[in-house]
Amino acid sequence: MRTIGVISDTHGLLREEAVDALKDSDLILHAGDVGGAGILEVLSGIAPVFVVKGNNDYDEGASNWPKREVVHLSEGTSPVLAYMLHDISDLDLDPSSVGFAVVVYGHSHRPAMEWSGGVLYFNPGAAGHRRFNLPVTVGRLRVDERGRVSSEIIELEETI
């Protein structure tokens, strides 16, 4: 079983609770609006990190981040591919027709897990500052040996 931590919209705040929730990840996906490369440095101390640029990522390092990313979530013979982007309204392809099992996105700060056409559309919500009266969350994907994907949203206890 492979565990993928998913985080988005940290906006410069990486909560200790988020780090704890992601600590057993084999891979971490950040769906944008990071708010500084220091956050990625901390996350990369846990597991390899993939990131896409969000609409508020203006710092110097962010200029090199892709707007879209393809990530292999599984190891072995049955590949499980994820397509990452920050804003789902910028989705520029039909994920099921090109073989993606998961679309990971952020931007709205609203956690979401929805299956459509055999594809999981997954937004971990926002892990940074609370906004819009929404919970502070991260996500987790699990991929088993047969390539089956399961997902969960983890609501964080706030200490800030």
Where does each model-flagged region fall?
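Conserved beta-sheet core of the metallophosphoesterase superfamily
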Residues: 50, 81, 88-152
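N-terminal active-site segment of His-dependent metallophosphoesterases
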Residues: 1-49, 57-67, 134-137, 160
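General small-molecule cofactor/ligand-binding pocket signal
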Residues: 5, 50, 72, 152-154
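Helix-adjacent hinge/juxtasegments
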Residues: 50-90, 97-99
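Active-site metal-binding loops of divalent metal-dependent hydrolases
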Residues: 8-12, 32-34, 55-57, 86-89, ...
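Structural motif
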Residues: 4, 27, 80-82, 102
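Short, solvent-exposed aromatic-acidic interface loops
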Residues: 150-160
